[in-house]
Amino acid sequence: WIQQHTPDDISGGYSESLSDMIVDSRETLLRVLHYPHLTGHEPTGALRAAAHEDINLITILPSSNQSGLQVKGSDGRWIDVPEGDDKLVVNIGDMLQEVSGGYYPSTTHRVINPTFAANKPRMSLPLFLHPRPDVRLSERYTAASYLEERLRELGVK
């Protein structure tokens, strides 16, 4: 869907189609994130996961069973992502921002304490779609070199 709705002058710069970039990738991963229920002493709106962007191409996640996920709009305001069984959230990652030359900016997002039903735990199942390490993201980076640099910046490597 993203590839189909990308202007030709942008997608023409891709080294290969987005769907081909993830074929046979061993970097793609599914995570199970559990946020325990709140005790009632935590302030509403306090951070559970600080604002960040994902390193990968695209993150796909079914909407959580609990509110709290927010995305940062282009105006700098935080927008609540609705929860519900029939919703799917798609976040643009840093690698797609790189491969698109900034046409698709990374989705800045965070998780805050819910305003209601805080006695329920929050579950999230993000699927982080990564390209194969050999995929050329830009003149400057392959997927492997980009990931390595970002992990060093984060102090993970």
Where is each model-derived feature located?
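C-terminal flanking tails of non-heme Fe-dependent oxygenases
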Residues: W1-K157
